[in-house]
Amino acid sequence: VNGKKYIEIGDYCLIGRNSHITAHEMPQYNTPVKISIGDGCMFGPDMHITAVNSIRIGKNVRTGKSVLISDNSHGDPKDMALRNIAPNARPIYSKGAIVIGDNVWIGEKAAILAGVTIGEGAIIGANAVVTKNIPPYSIAAGIPARIIK
C-alpha cells in the first residue's frame, strides 16, 4: 500500500497476496486523491488499484485475480509530443474518477479504466476492459466491455 493517508479500507476486507494499492499525490489536481474500499470486499491475488483522482469501491465487491482498477495512465494518448518519451517518464493523466457499486463481481484479469461507474450488483466478465458506464444488475463482457445481459 502506497499513499496510506489517502486510502480507506473498510472492515472485514480480504486483499490477495502480491496486490498493490497506490494513491499518487498529484498537486496539479484541485482535489486530493482518494481510494475508498467498502466493508466486506474480497480481492483476488495480484490486484492492482492505482489512483491520482478518485476510486470508490462499494461494499461486498468481489474480484478474481489480476484485476486492474486505474483512473490514470502515463500521458494523454492524444498528445503526439509525448510519444517520444518513455511511458514511465510521462506525466500521469486521469480522465476521471471510478465508482464501483455495492455487490459487484469482477472476473479474473478484468481492467476497470478511468471515468466509469459500475452499478450495484453488476457482473464484469473475465478479461473484460471496462471503458464506459455499466448499469446496475447487468452483465458486461468483452474488449471493450459491452452489456450482454
Residue ranges and their predicted role:
Residues 2-114, 143:
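Flexible, glycine/small-residue-enriched loop-and-beta-strand segment within the central core
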Residues 148-149:
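Short active-site-adjacent structural elements
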Residues 111-145:
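C-terminal/domain-terminus segments
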